[in-house]
Amino acid sequence: MTPLCHAPVWELVASGPQTVFPLLSQKTPTERRLVLDHLDYSIVRQYWDAAATSATAASYMAHEQGLPQSCVEHRFARERAVVQPWFDDLTSESSILDIGCGAGAWTMLFAQQHRRVVGIDMSPNMLAAARTRLGDMGNVELIEGDALQAPIEGTFDGAFVGGVLMYMNRDDAVLLLERLRLLVPTGPIVLRESTVRRGVEVKNAEYHVAYRSPTEYEAIAADAGLTVIAVERNRGYADMEVAVELVNLARRIPVLGRRDPELVGSPLWRALDMTAPVTLGLLPRAIEAVGVAWPHLTNHFMLLGTVELAQDLGH
């Protein structure tokens, strides 16, 4: 799919494979210049089709560093602790829309708790992995396609969007949230997106992605007629990102760089897990305390809904 043209929101301050856009409001009018996201969706699709050979790890971005299944499980457990309370008002008779369902980890969890679950993903290889995981669960429908255009019947009581908007140009992200506002008219919409602390960073070389700040997602939601009710940092992602950064650092050593990633990632994660209070807790905070944003990427959960839902929840 060819990316659409987009609303002029950001100023280009660097060029090359990674482009950084600060908040426009922080610049004077003479400094402002209009730019576009320029994400190529065909490249996004190619990346995920290739990554799906290790679908479970890939859906949690653990595949390139050879991180083990125990790392994926650690992250998923910490994520569930954030997300599940946001769906507490739903019942066993509720329906959930899972956009960007990947290998089906969240799809299975929702299907175990609710009457109807529809999962959507653009990667046939990811959906094949999801079908294997889900087996003969009869209350799940999986749809291959673009979440903007895929045929979706009925409305839902809640939606989960797992790392999808970061692969969409801004205008399309607004359009998707507008569609969700109609598909989930009264319930919670939960986003999980990799983020940066300020502004937007766009990578558009061999890997196309737009890392936005939570503040920018608030603006995108507002443009779609939705309210950001709550924002929570994804601690499970943060733990895994520490491992990712350390594996990347270790693999700069020639003898380690030539090895299978699993021979580096697996033992490193075990060491981090055994020393978690220091390596996953104190170390990142100590580095941030001296003014270094590390790990570079963050990840956030954002609870979205209508103004009426926000009022019902006391926000």
Residues of each region from the PLM?
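Short catalytic micro-motifs in class I SAM-dependent methyltransferases
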Residues: 163-167
